[in-house]
Amino acid sequence: KTLQHKIKNMRKKSNFFHDNKPFLSLPNNDIEKGYKLLNKYGIEKKDKWICVFNRDPSYLKSFIKKDWSYHDYRDFPIDDLKGAINYFIKKNYFVIRVGSVSEGSLSISNNKYFDYTNSSIKSAFMDCFLLSKCEMFFGGSSGICLFTASFRKPYFLINNCPLEGIFSIKRIYPALFKRIKNLKDNKILSIREMVDRDLCNIFTSEGFKIKNVTNINNTEDEIKEFAIEALNILINNVESKDKSLNHQKKELFKSEIVRDSAIRNLEYENPIGSSFLEKTFIK
């Protein structure tokens, strides 16, 4: 069976996390152990932190017996998160970069930023601890998101690709997707054109090459704007209602994406970042 077919079968129980209570928790002694390790880096029990994550090829490259480059279309550099990270810090949150393996580092000279991925305390246990106690997860879509969802922590995803991935499971928090550019004329395609050219559910880098298109990462400014929206949702303890977004634009977006045969059978009501959608060409 094709990779795309396997992925669609995995997504059938799309409401699993949304409709069920948390099924993972850490015992008190492990929680105390986690706080003790964090304290070495100046993060105390009373402090609040946000976990950030960028997907890059380093993790899959660690599996040397297989070529994982077909996943490269999902990657983006950590530098694109710099504006969002500085915003979170300005709002008095610690920001912890998570991930078991990563490429590159971010030049932020602030003790509220902790690059856990390149630290001496990195472990499977600390991965779980940090995600279970964070205020929210903010970053790219990958397997690490399942841990966040398992602990029912708010998670705001960026650079989702393909577009179908945003609607794979039921979400109450908005997300951003990668726009698509036509290589022949460098034109950024509208949502309608993406649907018409069957570009919403391609799951390999080669698939995009065959279609003569490429993905465009969310810009640093777009990600920062989304960070502002995410924190507003978090602080006000409300689901995303996209109150500032024109209702007509939302309905127009929905009317176009449901033309895709796969998306119409998924959670197409899932919210998109308000500011991002306002700037997206629909038709």
Where does each model-flagged region fall?
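Leloir-type glycosyltransferase catalytic cores
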Residues: 1-40, 171-283
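Short, flexible/disordered intra-domain loops and linkers
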Residues: 60-74
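A structural signal for well-ordered alpha-helical segments within the folded catalytic domains
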Residues: 79-82, 125, 142, 146, ...
